[in-house]
C-alpha cells in the first residue's frame, strides 16, 4: 500500500494548529469545531503512519543484516525473529490506516434522539422500555454524555409506552447508531405464577439531531410576472402594473401579492411569502425522510424481527447480526454497553474494508 501522499501531514497539522489559535476561527464555533475534528483525525493518522514508516525501515534494516555474509550468526537470529514480528505489525498498521481513512458517516459527530417504544408483549414490553432507557442512560453517564427526556408516555406499572430523549456529547451517533431495531426480552414476569418465560419486544430508533434547514433561493429559478391589481369583482384598482406573481420553477409554487401600490413592495412581500412556503416544503420533506428512516430502522415491533435478545433466566445477551453471545446480562443492563457496541463497530469496519478490496 502506497502512503506517499501522507508525507505532507506534518505541514497540514501545523497549518491547522495555526488556525486553532486564530481569534476569528475561535469565535466561529462551527468552523472551530470543524478544524478541531480535522486536526484530531490527521494527528491520529500521522501517528500511525509514522509508526508504519518506521516499521518498514526496520524491515529493510533486518533484511540487510540477514543478507550480509559477514554478520554475526546470533545477530542474524535476532534479526530473523524481529523480522517476523515486524511483518505482523506492518499488516496491523496497514489495516489501522485503512480504517482511519474509511469514509466517515456525516452524522457520527451529531447529538442523537433515542426513541424507545413498547412493541408486542403488553405490560412486559412497557417495563422493558424502562429497563432499556436505564441501560442507555447509564452508558451515557460513563461516556460523559448528557441525557434530556423530550417526551414520555409512562404507564402505572412503572414502564413506558414510549420515551424519547436527546443525548448530547462527543461521537454519540457513532456509538448508538447500531442500536436501532427490535430488542427482544425473554423473562418470567412478576405476575406469572406458573414460572413461564414470556417473550416481549421493544423498538429502538436512533436518529441524528437535524441541523436547522438553511434555505437559498436561486433567483434564476424564479419567474416574475407583473400585472394590474384587481379589486372585488375583478375591477382594476390601479392604473400601473404593481401586482407581482412569482413562480418557483423547480417546485411550481406560485405566490401573488397585490396589496401594496408599489411594485417593489409587492415583490418583497411575495419573496417573503415564497421563502416561508419553500422552507415549510423542505422541512415537511425532511420530516418525511426522518419518518421513513424511523420505520426502516425499527420494523413493526414484531418479536421475530429482532436484532438482539436479552434472556434473563440464562443471563444471556445475543446480538443476532454478528452472532455475538455474552453471558453478562446484568453487567450490560447496568450500562456496560461497550461490550456489545465495540464488536459491532469492528464488524462494520471489516465489512467496509471488504468493499474497498
Curated annotation (Swiss-Prot):
Gene3D superfamilies: 3.30.160.20, 3.30.70.1660, 6.10.140.1950. The modification N5-methylglutamine is found at residue 235. It is found in: Cytoplasm. GO terms for cellular component: cytoplasm. Pfam families: PCRF, RF-1. Its main location: cytoplasm. Methylated by PrmC. Methylation increases the termination efficiency of RF1. Keywords: Cytoplasm, Methylation, Protein biosynthesis. InterPro entries: PCRF, Pep_chain_release_fac_I, Pep_chain_release_fac_I_sf, Prokaryotic/Mito_RF, RF-1. GO terms for molecular function: translation release factor activity, codon specific. SUPFAM superfamilies: Release factor. PANTHER family: LD18447P. Peptide chain release factor 1 directs the termination of translation in response to the peptide chain termination codons UAG and UAA. Belongs to the prokaryotic/mitochondrial release factor family. This is Peptide chain release factor 1. It comes from Desulfotalea psychrophila (strain LSv54 / DSM 12343).
Amino acid at each position: 500500500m502506497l502512503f506517499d501522499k501522507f508525507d505532507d501531514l506534518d505541514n497540514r497539522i501545523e497549518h491547522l494548529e495555526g488556525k486553532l489559535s486564530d481569534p476569528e476561527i475561535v469565535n466561529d464555533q462551527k468552523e472551530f469545531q470543524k478544524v478541531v475534528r480535522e486536526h484530531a483525525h490527521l494527528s491520529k493518522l500521522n501517528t500511525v503512519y509514522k509508526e508504519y514508516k518506521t516499521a518498514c525501515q526496520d524491515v529493510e534494516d533486518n533484511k540487510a543484516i540477514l543478507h550480509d555474509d559477514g554478520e554475526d550468526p546470533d545477530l542474524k537470529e535476532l534479526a530473523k525473529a524481529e523480522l517476523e514480528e515486524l511483518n505482523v505489525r506492518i499488516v496491523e498498521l496497514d489495516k489501522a490506516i485503512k480504517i482511519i481513512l474509511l469514509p466517515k458517516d456525516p452524522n457520527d459527530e451529531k447529538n442523537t434522539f433515542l426513541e424507545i417504544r413498547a412493541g408486542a408483549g403488553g405490560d412486559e414490553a412497557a417495563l422493558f422500555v424502562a429497563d432499556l432507557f436505564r441501560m442507555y442512560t447509564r452508558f451515557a453517564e460513563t461516556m460523559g454524555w448528557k441525557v434530556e427526556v423530550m417526551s414520555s408516555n409512562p404507564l402505572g406499572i412503572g414502564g413506558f409506552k414510549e420515551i424519547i430523549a436527546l443525548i448530547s456529547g462527543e461521537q454519540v451517533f457513532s456509538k448508538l447508531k447500531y442500536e436501532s431495531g427490535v430488542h427482544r426480552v425473554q423473562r418470567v414476569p412478576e405476575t406469572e405464577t406458573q414460572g413461564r418465560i414470556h417473550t416481549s419486544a421493544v423498538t429502538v430508533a436512533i436518529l441524528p439531531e437535524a441541523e436547522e434547514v438553511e434555505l437559498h433561493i436561486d433567483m434564476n429559478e424564479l419567474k416574475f410576472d407583473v400585472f394590474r391589481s384587481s379589486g372585488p369583482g375583478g375591477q382594476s384598482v390601479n392604473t400601473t402594473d404593481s401586482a407581482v406573481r412569482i413562480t418557483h420553477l423547480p417546485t411550481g409554487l406560485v405566490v401573488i401579492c397585490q396589496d401594496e401600490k408599489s411594485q417593489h413592495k409587492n415583490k418583497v412581500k411575495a419573496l417573503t411569502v415564497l421563502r416561508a412556503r419553500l422552507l415549510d416544503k423542505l422541512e415537511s420533506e425532511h420530516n418525511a425522510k426522518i419518518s421513513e428512516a424511523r420505520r426502516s430502522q425499527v420494523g413493526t415491533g414484531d418479536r421475530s424481527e429482532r436484532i438482539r435478545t436479552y434472556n434473563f433466566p440464562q443471563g444471556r445477551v445475543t446480538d443476532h447480526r454478528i452472532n455475538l453471545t455474552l453471558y453478562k446480562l446484568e453487567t450490560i443492563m447496568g450500562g456496560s454497553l461497550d461490550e456489545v457496541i465495540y464488536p459491532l463497530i469492528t464488524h462494520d469496519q471489516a465489512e467496509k474494508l471488504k468493499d474497498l478490496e
